[in-house]
Amino acid sequence: MSTPRLADVLDNADVIHERAALEAAIEGMADAIRDDYADDARPPLFVTIMHGGMPFAARLAFALGERGLDVEFDYLHATRYRGNTSGSGLAWLHRPATSMEGRRVLLVDDILDEGHTLKAVTRWCEDQDAADVRVAVLAVKVHDRCVDGVCADYVGVEVPDRYVFGYGMDFHEQGRNLPAIYALAD
């Protein structure tokens, strides 16, 4: 089966959040994060969850810098999707090289859907003796299937319980660089 062309999918997709709304939400998140970390003696460890978190993480990092909050960068790559539209078992492709022992860690991801990936990643950070682990996501999907105890500390926008893509989220590995969030047609 061939992968649908993104251009064909976009013709029938709904725009859920325009770029301006996403950037305004990120600015608001940056204010809250700065307030929570401003008094720390050491910059927080800002861990981007690849690949989806990259566009959001870049914009959030700049917004934090504009507010005078320095961060130390690292990344991880753990996925359940691997180019599919539904998840399976978690695969670790890269773990952060920076020691988390005693550190305040900010995990940055594109979306909180059911929470399986974020739960596993958060637990792993805690097992590395992180002092504190918080989660920032661009989007939270609205439904009742989230894993118990999983939530984001900082949320940009809510999205409907549909397949969404753009601004880091992909449709068959396509469309991550779209400047808005779209949903497949019902």
Walk through the language-model features, giving the residues of each:
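PRPP-associated nucleotide enzymes
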Residues: 1-186
